[in-house]
UniProtKB/Swiss-Prot annotation:
Name of the protein in question: Small ribosomal subunit protein uS7
SUPFAM superfamilies the record matches: Ribosomal protein S7
Cited InterPro entries: Ribosomal_uS7 (IPR000235), Ribosomal_uS7_bac/org-type (IPR005717), Ribosomal_uS7_CS (IPR020606), Ribosomal_uS7_dom (IPR023798), Ribosomal_uS7_dom_sf (IPR036823)
Protein family according to the UniProt entry: Belongs to the universal ribosomal protein uS7 family.
Coiled coil (UniProt feature): none
Function statement: One of the primary rRNA binding proteins, it binds directly to 16S rRNA where it nucleates assembly of the head domain of the 30S subunit. Is located at the subunit interface close to the decoding center, probably blocks exit of the E-site tRNA.
Known partners and oligomeric status: Part of the 30S ribosomal subunit. Contacts proteins S9 and S11.
UniProt keywords, alphabetically: Ribonucleoprotein, Ribosomal protein, RNA-binding, rRNA-binding, tRNA-binding
Molecular function GO labels: rRNA binding; structural constituent of ribosome; tRNA binding
Any one cellular-component term (Gene Ontology): small ribosomal subunit
Length: 156
């Protein structure tokens, strides 16, 4: 293991419109090739669309939707005596959020709406209702962990 000091996590600046760190972090997940202004317009467009449809505070809606997508457990591969076991592990809070955001963006990208903002809005609305590809991904991960519960004594 490295003997250097542990590097402190960088402070993420809140987004300009809602002054929310979570939305700023989500923008960074949506961003491709460093084009933050495009990612910003996509996320704000999606949140406006959600606000039009549901008549709710977009930040609050986003937070609750993200909470529904966050995984509690996941499986990690662990080699024991030549065999590889899928060992269920609890997910630490920062990784839960990162996975949920990644799954939302990936699920939105695979949708068929015309613009990414519409796809993202659709995926957020679906996730809030407990359906959609991001929720399915979470359930698949939980199912894998449940199926491999027998190997939980191999924890790291």
């Amino acid at each position: 293991m490295p003997r250097r000091r542990v590097v402190a996590a960088r402070e993420i600046l809140p987004d300009p419109k809602f002054s929310s760190q979570t939305i700023a972090k989500f923008m960074n997940h949506v961003m491709q090739d460093g084009k933050k202004s495009i990612a910003e317009s996509i996320v704000y467009g999606a949140l406006e669309r959600v606000q039009e449809k549901n008549k709710v505070d977009p930040v609050e809606f986003f937070e609750t939707t993200l909470e529904k997508v966050r995984p509690m457990v996941e499986v990690k591969a662990r080699r024991v005596g030549g065999a590889t076991y899928q060992v269920p592990m609890e997910v630490r809070p920062s990784r839960r959020t990162a996975l949920a955001m990644r799954w939302l963006v990936d699920a939105a990208a695979k949708r068929s709406e015309k613009t990414m903002a519409l796809r993202l809005a659709g995926e957020l609305l679906d996730a809030a209702e407990g359906k959609g590809a991001a929720i399915k991904k979470r359930e698949d991960v939980h199912r894998m962990a449940e199926a491999n519960k027998a190997f939980s004594h191999y924890r790291f």
